[in-house]
Amino acid sequence: MAKSKKKTVFFCKQCGYESSKWLGQCPGCHEWDSFVEEPVAKAVPGVSGTVSATKKDAVPTLLSNVTTDDENRISTKISEMDRVLGGGIVVGSLVLVGGDPGIGKSTLLLQMCRNLSDEGKKVLYVSGEESLRQIKMRAERLGTFSRDISILCETDLDIISNSITDMMPDVVIIDSIQTMYREDVGSAPGSVSQVREATSILMRIAKGLHITVFIVGHVTKEGVVAGPRVLEHMVDTVLYFEGDGGASFRFLRGVKNRFGSTNEIGVFEMRADGLREVLNPSEYMLQGKPENEAGSVVACSIEGTRPILVEVQALVCRTNFNMPRRTSAGTDYNRVNLLLAVMEKRIGLHLGDCDAYINVAGGMRINEPALDMGIVLAVLSSYKNIAIDSKTICFGE
């Protein structure tokens, strides 16, 4: 008797669109060559009771009868993180924290767990990438830890769900979502269907049991969280932890927040004993700035509700090639090309035979249009070899 063919479907890696056959372009997000083939998950009776435990009879409620007086935010005791979250953690929220491997995501969340446990909160840290011994070693490096932090090294989401319902913690950390799986979903951990199923279950746990869940997600080479784009749509808040691998500064940026602004940014410094908050980023950004040096300008950018001073560096030199080079770090490349074209058109600065290198010192990435004036002055300063007064601050579009 011939074996029955295993049924498969195709998922879009970007948005999670499902199709019975392979498509060159996704009808949902219009991405090309984004479909992957995965087996269809079979329904298994009597799966984890967590979903049913969080499922309650839905009853329509008048909006006027809904009260929010008891929805107090929980402070992480990390002021820079509270700033990005909009004032603290919202109970029952689902937060996605993305970033490059080794950037410090786990360190940041482990420090948050320590602060929450010191305030009497029950915390469950679920790790699918490290052993108990490794987590203990990292915790000892960060300092004194409370005994109230529970650690679970597991990747089976059904076991994790049961542990959450038994313990009923205030905050859960999932590190990372790409390692979680369910046995009844017939695909490898990190696949589109596994990530989508895991996020769906965690969302129901967060909303049904009023437990705040932090999800750690790795990013792709394009700088977005690996997995289906629907992952970012399902969560309440999306935070990106960024930074230059060669610099000590780290930046926590919100790209989605249902409970606050997405314009805020948190600044940290990576040290041997963990992350340290930078309450005055301008002071740190201008450390080591050379005085009376051509091509170096202090510019001002508004990040959220506070101004930040940064050093804009430019190097303009004669090119040895037919096509001059244009590079930028920390700011938009196309914006730099636009400004160079405006300078050539309006003030007659001919850079057709010159290479131009633009850099925002400190590893910070700024898309603020007010940085335009700093870029223009830095390029002029380098081209004319004239230093700008170190006490001069420029900003303007």
Provide a role label for each language-model segment:
Residues 130-131:
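Conserved Rossmann-like nucleotide-cofactor binding loop
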Residues 3-14, 18-83, 90-98, 103-114, ...:
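Peripheral, non-AAA+ core regions of ATP-driven protein-machinery
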